[in-house]
Amino acid sequence: VRRLGLLPGGEPDGLGDDVRLTGAALDQRVVVFFPEPLRNGYQLEQWLPVLEALHARQGVAVITQDSRTAAWLRGRTALPVLCVARTATLDGIVQRSDVALALYVSHHPRNFQMLRFSTLGHVYIGHGESDKAVSASNQLKAYDRVFVAGRAAEDRILTELLWFDRSHLVRVGRPQAAAPAPRPVPAVPTVLYAPTWEGAQPSMAYSSVPTHGSTLVSSLVAAGMRVVYRPHPRTGANRRDVAAADAALRRLLEAPEAQRTGSRTDPDRPLQEAFEDVDVLVTDVSSVALEWLPTGRPLVVTVPADPAAVAAASPLLDAVPRLPSSAAGSAGTVVRRCLDDDREAPARAELVEHYLGGSDPDAALSRFLGACDDVIAARDAVRGALSRAGR
């Protein structure tokens, strides 16, 4: 079953390199623990350039529990990638190594297989800043430190979580955030429609694909706009109706009317590259909305149709036009107004610092690397004191 890839979607295949890793030790001081299946590889991919910079000064190894994920990562980075299926193998590697820091980009339950080690520091770095409920998950309390982009994350966590220790939050900015070169709006403007996925539970049902999608895109195309549809990698993973709506959207963009404006589906292009030749973003409550802010270009955010979706008021949602499902047919009019009269631009500009800690990726990278160095130094000091005390 494992070798045929027939496991449930969220389960790693557990086909590890354990035999080869017998007796192995790591030279690296940092590990990234990523037990996710391949479909969630995007969560780590965005961090690879940053982790490669950290590797140059501390050494970084990635530990996975899925052979498909490991193979995929090896094709995208020169970082050492290990696939460890057995707890005993992981125990041995940690015990034989002087790993000082473990980083985590997701809330996978299997993170606790690494979190149980008390000899190193554990830091959650996430995979994007957003106003989603999961951004203030109580699971954050499991980590020694939580690296956040800006004040918005600090405020959200301290407001939503009971008894969270403020000293565990470290503001580092967003190394992935960068402002593309300004661009004049062409005669045929390009709209990036980048909805999120349906989520794993009702409180996370932010996706507009089944509730807005076809009507929204039809309105934009009818208004003479080029639409680039960038679905989330997990769109349709949990709900057949969302998968069907996604398929319908793809067919819609292949129709002659959409083709006349150059509309297309483009799911694979890196996000920052996708931003470069786009004039407006229409998205859901998600990290994509915040990554867009440094562009300075208009932004429209949908309103979740599912009343169970947790979408509390926030500085971002208060500052941009919102599009409920009942108004999806007016998307073309809303976007045209934003292009002709971008009255929200000053408010959005103020939010770049609030959410992302600025738009200088080099400064954010420096803060991230320094924060990792600090955790390693603090861990080494504690371990050294314990060793001198004979413990």
Task: Please provide the spans of the model-predicted regions.
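N-terminal pre-catalytic "stem/leader" segment of glycosyltransferase-like enzymes
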Residues: 1-95, 383-391
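A nucleotide-sugar donor-handling region in carbohydrate enzymes
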Residues: 2-16, 139-211
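Conserved catalytic-core segment of nucleotide-activated headgroup transferases in glycan assembly
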Residues: 39-53, 58-59, 177-251, 357-366, ...
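Extended catalytic core of nucleotide-activated donor transferases of GT-like folds
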Residues: 48, 67-139
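Short internal beta-strands
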Residues: 57-67, 145-150, 228-232
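A donor-sugar binding/catalytic signature common to diverse glycosyltransferases
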Residues: 123-124, 268-310
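Nucleotide-activated donor-binding/catalytic signature segment of Leloir-type glycosyltransferases, i.e.
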Residues: 243-267
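C-terminal amphipathic helix plus adjacent low-complexity
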Residues: 332-391
